[in-house]
C-alpha cells in the first residue's frame, strides 16, 4: 500500500494509508486543484506535450521570456528569492536587459549583476557590516551560478565563474550564526565538496538533512533550494556534490552508476560531525537525485528516511522520453540557441562531447536500482506538471509499489499554487512544508 496526497481545495487527502499512524489523516490546506478551468492555454498545451514527451524544463506559467528554456531558468532563479538567492528588483532589471533566447546575453547580464553584488559585499565586510556582506555574497554567488547555466565548459570564463560561485558562498557562510562551513569528502583519489550548517554548534546530536542535487546542479543550488528552511525546521543542513555535479566534471569526474560508493564516503564523514544524530538522518535527492539517492539507499541502511523529487527507477527509460531522444539530429540542430546550450552543458556532465546530446540516452543504460531493497520510510514529491507524463507516472508507481517498506507517501503539488514544475523549484516554501511536516512525523514516530 502507498499513501497518495493530492493538494486540493479543502484538504490534503491520503488516498490510501501506508502505516497505521498515518491512516485517516487530513491536513487543512487552501490549495486549488491543478485542473482549474482558468489555466492559461499555453499551460494546457505544455501539459498536453508533457504527456508524450518528458521535458524537465517545461514550464506551466510564463514569467518573462518567450524562450521557454530561458524562462524556466529565470523561474528557477525567482524561486530562490524566498531563500536569499535573489532580489526581485535585481532579477527583473537583469531580465529586462537580456536579449530573449541569447545564451551570451544571459551570461553577460547575470555576470554584471554578480560583480555588483560581490563589490557591495566586500565593501560591507570592510566596514564591519556583516549582515549586508552576507546577503550580498549570497546573491553574488547565485547570480554567478545563473550566468553559468547556458555557458559551455570550453568557454574561457567557465572555470573562473565557477570559482566565483564557490568563493562568494564560502564567504557568506562564514557570516551565518552558526557558520555554514565548507568541507571536503575524500573519495578515491579526489575530494567531493560540501557545506555543513548545524542548527547550533553545541555538540548535541540533532535531526539532519543531507541534500543531493541532480543532473545539472551545484551544491550552491542546494543551499538556495532548502538550507534556510532546513534550519528553520530544526534540522542540520548538509549538501555535497557527487561526480557529474558542480565543477567536478572539469576535473574529469562525470556521472557514475555506483552512487552507493559516493554516498557511503559522504556518510562516513558527516556521521563524525557531533551535531548529526545517526538515528535521524534523512537524505533528499532532486531531479536525477531521484536515482542517485535511492540507488544508495538500497545498500546504505544508515539512511533513516528518504525523500525524492521525483523517483527515477530507470534512467534509460526516462531519457528515451526526452526531446533529444525523440528529435532527429537535424531537428536538434535547429533548436533555439539557449535550449541547445543548456542541453549540451548537461551532456558534458555524462562524459560526452557536448554536441552529442542524443548520446545521453545510451549513456544512461544500467542506471537503475531495485526499490525492494529500500527499507526506510520514503516520501516522493512530484509537481503536477511532471506527473502528467506517462513515463514519470509509471516510474513513480513502479517505485512505490515495489518498495521494501510500507511507510511510503507520494505528494502531487498543484499547478495553481505555482508548484507544478520540475522539483517544485518555483515554490520552495510549499515543497519544504510538505517535506518537513512529513519528516517530523517520521522521526517523531521513532
Describe each PLM feature range:
Residues 205-214:
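Short beta-strand element of the alpha/beta-hydrolase
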Residues 253-274:
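Alpha/beta-hydrolase active-site loop
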Residues 276-287:
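Alpha/beta-hydrolase fold nucleophile elbow
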Residues 298-356, 376, 390-391:
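Hydrolase active-site cap/lid region
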Residues 348-414:
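Serine-hydrolase catalytic core
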Residues 416-428:
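Catalytic histidine-centered segment of alpha/beta-hydrolase-like enzymes
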Residues 425-446:
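Catalytic active-site module of serine/aspartate enzymes centered on a nucleophile-bearing elbow/loop
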Amino acid at each position: 500500500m502507498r499513501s497518495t496526497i493530492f493538494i486540493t481545495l479543502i484538504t490534503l487527502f491520503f488516498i490510501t494509508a501506508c502505516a497505521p499512524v498515518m491512516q485517516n489523516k487530513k491536513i487543512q490546506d487552501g490549495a486549488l486543484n491543478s485542473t482549474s478551468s482558468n489555466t492559461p492555454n499555453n499551460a494546457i498545451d505544455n501539459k498536453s506535450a508533457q504527456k508524450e514527451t518528458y521535458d524537465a524544463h517545461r514550464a506551466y506559467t510564463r514569467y518573462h521570456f518567450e524562450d521557454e528554456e530561458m524562462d524556466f531558468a529565470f523561474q528557477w532563479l525567482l524561486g530562490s528569492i524566498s531563500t536569499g538567492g535573489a532580489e526581485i528588483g535585481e532579477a527583473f532589471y537583469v531580465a529586462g536587459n537580456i536579449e530573449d533566447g541569447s545564451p551570451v546575453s544571459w551570461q553577460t547580464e547575470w555576470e554584471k549583476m554578480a560583480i555588483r553584488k560581490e563589490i557591495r559585499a566586500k565593501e560591507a565586510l570592510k566596514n564591519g557590516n556583516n549582515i549586508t556582506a552576507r546577503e550580498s555574497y549570497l546573491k553574488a554567488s547565485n547570480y554567478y551560478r545563473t550566468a553559468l547555466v547556458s555557458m559551455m565548459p570550453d568557454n574561457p570564463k567557465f572555470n573562473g565563474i565557477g570559482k566565483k560561485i564557490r568563493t562568494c558562498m564560502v564567504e557568506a557562510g562564514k557570516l551565518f550564526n552558526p557558520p555554514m562551513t565548507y568541507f571536503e569528502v575524500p573519495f578515491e583519489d579526489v575530494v567531493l565538496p560540501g557545506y555543513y550548517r548545524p542548527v547550533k554548534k553545541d555538540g548535541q546530536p540533532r535531526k539532519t538533512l543531507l541534500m543531493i542535487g541532480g543532473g545539472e546542479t551545484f551544491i550552491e543550488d542546494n543551499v538556495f533550494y532548502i538550507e534556510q528552511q532546513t534550519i528553520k525546521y530544526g534540522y542540520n543542513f548538509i549538501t555535497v556534490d557527487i561526480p557529474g555535479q558542480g565543477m567536478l566534471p572539469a576535473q574529469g569526474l562525470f556521472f557514475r552508476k555506483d552512487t552507493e560508493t559516493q554516498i557511503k564516503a559522504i556518510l562516513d564523514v558527516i556521521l563524525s560531525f557531533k551535531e548529526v544524530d545517526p538515528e535521524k538522518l534523512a537524505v533528499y535527492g532532486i531531479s536525477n537525485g531521484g536515482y542517485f539517492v535511492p540507488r544508495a539507499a538500497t545498500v546504505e541502511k544508515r539512511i533513516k528516511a528518504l525523500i525524492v523529487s521525483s523517483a527515477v527507477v530507470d534512467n534509460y527509460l526516462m531519457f528515451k522520453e526526452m526531446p533529444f531522444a525523440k528529435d532527429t539530429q537535424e531537428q536538434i540542430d535547429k533548436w533555439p540557441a539557449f535550449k541547445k546550450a543548456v542541453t549540451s552543458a548537461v551532456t558534458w556532465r555524462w562524459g560526452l562531447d557536448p554536441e552529442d546530446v542524443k548520446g545521453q540516452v545510451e549513456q544512461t543504460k544500467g542506471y537503475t536500482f531495485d526499490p525492494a531493497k529500500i527499507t526506510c520510510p520514503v516520501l516522493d514529491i512530484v509537481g503536477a506538471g511532471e506527473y502528467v507524463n506517462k513515463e514519470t507516472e509509471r516510474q513513480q508507481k513502479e517505485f512505490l509499489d515495489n518498495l521494501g517498506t510500507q511507510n511510503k507517501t507520494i505528494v502531487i503539488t498543484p499547478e495553481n499554487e505555482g508548484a507544478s514544475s520540475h522539483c517544485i523549484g518555483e515554490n520552495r516554501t510549499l515543497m519544504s512544508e510538505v517535506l518537513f511536516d512529513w519528516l517530523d512525523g517520521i522521526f517523531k514516530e521513532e
